[in-house]
């Protein structure tokens, strides 16, 4: 079954990506809701498909379904995180641009163990929490989603429905770049190409005795 929550959509078709000879699947609206669904026959494995969307104003748009991708955080990562032994958690949580199956996008992850729902909202989806609801990975408290088409420079926040029923927007605690105050949005950034120039300082730090030096 393919399901997609698409507010303001008039029609949706699931289009096979890697097997163009297969027929497209028209998704039907469920009642009066914004949910569309359709059945893929004889598909028991991971299935790559685009959503061809016709919006209410007649505009057409085609994109990969965010939920057609596997989680970008492994079970081992979650195991180490829950034990408190994940030493590079900043590489897992936050926002990280990447390419998956030839699709450019950004993987988002945040720890919100008491949340009822978490969505990533930003200028790429009209700040509408209905477009990119995230999925909780097991009982870890980590919510994750890969958002196709969201790239470097996109502004975003996490929209969280708390256990008390309050809907709040939060800045990413693992964000790499931010708007200038008083604005508070995080900005998707790629720091993999940053050239560090502190080799001399690192070497001197390793050679020095910290107990014999001033604290600052």
Each predicted region: which residue ranges?
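The feature marks proteins involved in alpha-glucan
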Residues: 1, 20-22, 30-112, 137-216
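Short proline/glycine-enriched turn/loop motifs at strand-loop junctions of beta-rich domains
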Residues: 5-11, 111-118
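Active-site-flanking structural segment that lines cofactor/substrate pockets
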Residues: 10-14, 22-27
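Short beta-strand elements bearing conserved aromatic residues within extracellular beta-rich modules
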Residues: 12-14, 118-120, 156
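Short acidic, flexible loop segments centered on an aromatic residue
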Residues: 15-19, 122-124
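Short beta-strand and strand-turn-strand segments in soluble, beta-rich domains
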Residues: 21-22, 126-131
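Aromatic-rich, solvent-exposed beta-strand/loop patch
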Residues: 119-128, 208-216
């Amino acid at each position: 079954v393919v399901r997609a929550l698409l507010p303001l959509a008039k029609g949706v078709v699931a289009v096979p990506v890697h097997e163009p000879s297969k027929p497209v699947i028209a998704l039907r609206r469920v009642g009066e809701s914004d949910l569309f669904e359709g059945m893929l026959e004889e598909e028991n494995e991971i299935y790559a498909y685009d959503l061809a969307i016709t919006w209410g104003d007649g505009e057409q748009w085609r994109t990969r379904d965010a939920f057609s991708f596997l989680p970008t955080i492994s079970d081992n990562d979650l195991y180490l995180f829950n034990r408190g032994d994940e030493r590079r958690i900043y590489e897992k949580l936050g926002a990280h641009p990447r390419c998956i199956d030839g699709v450019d996008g950004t993987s988002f992850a945040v720890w919100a163990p008491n949340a009822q729902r978490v969505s990533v909202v930003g200028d790429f989806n009209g700040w509408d929490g209905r477009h990119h609801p995230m999925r909780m990975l097991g009982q870890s408290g980590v919510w994750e989603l890969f958002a196709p088409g969201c790239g470097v420079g996109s502004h975003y926040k996490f929209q969280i429905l708390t256990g008390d029923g309050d809907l709040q927007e939060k800045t990413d605690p693992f964000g790499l770049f931010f708007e200038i105050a008083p604005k508070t949005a995080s900005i998707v950034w790629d720091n993999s190409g940053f050239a560090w120039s502190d080799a001399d300082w690192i070497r001197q730090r390793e050679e020095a005795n910290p107990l014999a030096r001033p604290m600052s």
